[in-house]
UniProtKB/Swiss-Prot annotation:
It catalyses: 5-(2-hydroxyethyl)-4-methylthiazole + ATP = 4-methyl-5-(2-phosphooxyethyl)-thiazole + ADP + H(+). CDD domains: THZ_kinase. InterPro entries: Hyethyz_kinase, Ribokinase-like. The keyword S-adenosyl-L-methionine does not apply. Its cofactor is Mg(2+). This is Hydroxyethylthiazole kinase. GO terms for biological process: thiamine biosynthetic process; thiamine diphosphate biosynthetic process. Catalyzes the phosphorylation of the hydroxyl group of 4-methyl-5-beta-hydroxyethylthiazole (THZ). It comes from Bacillus cereus (strain G9842). GO terms for molecular function: ATP binding; hydroxyethylthiazole kinase activity; magnesium ion binding.
Length: 269
């Protein structure tokens, strides 16, 4: 997997304008939609149980995010996910805050048990808690703790039969056999709410157009990280408000040439 291959997926997303169905949380809906539009994808936010199965059927990818968790949204996620499975639409799951409460953890484990996932993405604590591995968590944004992140990612990929993505200072992508590290991004991303949730939806746009899911995720993470770096160069001294706006600009303006120039990936043995 080389940077030229990775960069081509960015162009493919913009050429294809994939429809990404998001059942996401109320905190990030606007930011997620604008980020996908800036990238060149088409977002739809459909939550009603009466329509989610039909909407998932016509989407290029389905993103399930449990940030603001309510029983009616869990029901909608299950309906949409099962419809997506029947119609070969890739399902992405973001188990926000898994491990923070017993209810949240129960849902985070129930969804992969009921739905075949193409991708699961979270921080190390979230992914560890989904597969019932011990990892301390404090709040929905906790990602630090003790443990081997690559090992946890590989275990999750094997147990859930999916591509596991753990994001943090370094991002880990694995299907249990191929494992890739991505070293792009900027710390200011953690000062803007919803950047992780948007990332999962951006990955959705990439897997909608590239069926090699490891390659698709690596391309999405590299693109996202490079866009953040370019935005930070212009705005980091001004603060997170300016960064958020410039980041949307860079999601629109970051090119495949930028990916080839600034992308930092490493394939592990």
């Amino acid at each position: 997997m080389n940077m030229k291959e990775i960069s081509k997926v960015v162009d493919l997303v913009r050429e294809s304008n994939p429809l990404v169905h998001n059942i996401t949380n109320v905190v990030v809906t606007n930011f997620t939609a604008n980020g996908l539009l800036a990238l060149g994808a088409s977002p739809v936010m459909a939550y009603a149980k009466e329509e989610v199965a039909e909407m998932a059927n016509i989407a290029g990818a389905l993103v399930l995010n449990m940030g603001t968790l309510r029983p009616e949204e869990v029901e909608a996620m299950l309906l949409a996910g099962k419809s997506a499975n029947v119609n070969n639409v890739p399902v992405l799951f973001d188990p926000v805050g898994a491990g923070a409460t017993s209810y949240r953890t129960e849902v985070a484990r129930h969804i992969p048990a009921e739905i075949d996932l193409a991708i699961i993405r979270g921080n190390a604590a979230e992914i560890a808690n989904v597969i019932n591995e011990k990892w301390e968590i404090k709040g929905v944004d906790a990602g630090t703790g003790n443990g081997n992140v690559v090992s946890i990612a590989r275990q999750a990929a094997d147990e859930l039969n999916t591509v596991a993505v753990i994001t943090g200072k370094e991002d880990v992508v694995t299907d249990g056999e191929r494992t890739v590290l991505i070293r792009n991004g900027h710390p200011i991303l953690t000062k803007v709410t919803g950047t992780g949730c948007l990332l999962t939806s951006v990955i959705g746009a990439f897997v909608a157009v590239e069926k090699d899911y490891v390659k698709a995720v690596v391309a999405a993470l590299t693109f996202y990280g490079v866009a953040a770096e370019l935005a930070a160069v212009k705005t980091v001294e001004k603060g997170p408000g300016s960064f958020q706006i410039e980041f949307l600009n860079q999601l629109a303006n970051t090119t495949s040439a930028d990916i080839e120039k600034y992308g930092k990936i490493e394939e592990l043995e």
